């Protein structure tokens, strides 16, 4: 896909087909690939689209590119479907064909979208089950700022895929298994022994402190260390008391995680690492059957193809340690098999997406290669890692508290809302506006959380990004408050008497600002298709920001409520479609909108 979103995906597909047919008619015996190379026009003065396919044909056809372009245009002009869609094509430069959509076709499309709750975005014809694996915090540890990116990027991608009509299984692969549970269960048995006899739930207070205490005892006390190791064996062996303690720890963590998810409006199905325990031996058997398994220093490994260590030898993916234990790679392979496996013994997915930090890229590349070579990825299915960079402080270093600790997600969200509230109260004072406490709390909560989400999603996820409350809460620039304010501005038109629900007959546009807004609005479907394919939410953010800017220029430069009667309905229609597009687009980012701020 081009970096500039195409004007209407359906238009672009129609034009592409018309151009191919015209090229075929112009050069029926050409021994060359006939590709129109259709792309959105790089500048408005070049029209809506540019077809650059004449240039690469010059050599095989032994003709000048402009001559080739002229022959293609003659065939286009003989196609009534094309002439109904476009104005007369212009040949520019060495042989570019510039194409402009007829204004009446654009106006008709705006009308169609006004009556379409999907705003011109079609549902996929062949919906496929998709697994999106995101968030995935560890039990007995609080969610920190590092979980923020996976959680909100994964949620946004899931929303876009759901909107397109796919059945999406949102999976939370929580870290609920492993040797650390030995020390946690031992500590729990010693500090809250009664809980194991009676309680269905236990309140351990600050989970981070509980984890730290257990870790300190494990590091300092050999007897505690020894008991912890025995506890791991008991847990893996299914000892009922150990399982009860493990369950209590998982439940408390789950309750804490859910508070964050509720606050961020995140839906997830928990399926922790422990779910795959029964399937781990079958992973080893499957790799053995595929003749991929090699014993190396007592461990069972698969050596990767095309990936060497510093010594020049192939790197191994260890799937069973020399003591017989399994590891993350084994669990991830079991998860891949299950997710692609046919129902009822699997999820039957056709696309599996992992949203984790870029530091895990090599791990997943290795695991994916092993799964591919073992034959566990069905033909035509897609297995993708969606990596993201670090959240940094304004000093460019990893974001930490003043004390040097990891920033807890709960604290970060609290501060965002508090700062949004301070900004709002200050603005109300300046404007001498009086609002209810309920209004202030609702706006501050919405703006604060929107700012945090949007600041993250608007960055290219692959890069690190610097976290700044001042930047993300600013009313100017590519921020959530700027976009939310555009929605508020349009809601204000209705409050001032503009009927945004007015039944519009044939829309009439004359001003360049109107046409700029029309063209921007009609890019929405191609942007959604791009995000679905490339899994980059920042493309949607960039589009919504550009749309807000184009709308603000239109609203500032062209009268709306004071427009002439014949222009009023059409301009109100543009306002309504802009608000609908912003609301839907922000909703797909997991961001709620407001009618007043």
UniProtKB/Swiss-Prot annotation:
Which residue positions does the secretion signal occupy?
none
Task: Work out whether the entry's keyword set contains rRNA processing.
Answer: no
Provide the GO biological process annotations: arginyl-tRNA aminoacylation
> Could you tell me where this protein is found in the cell?
Cytoplasm
Please indicate the residue ranges that the annotation assigns to the motif 'HIGH' region.
137-147
The disulfide bridges present are none
The text of the family note is: Belongs to the class-I aminoacyl-tRNA synthetase family.
User: Any idea what this protein is called?
Assistant: Arginine--tRNA ligase
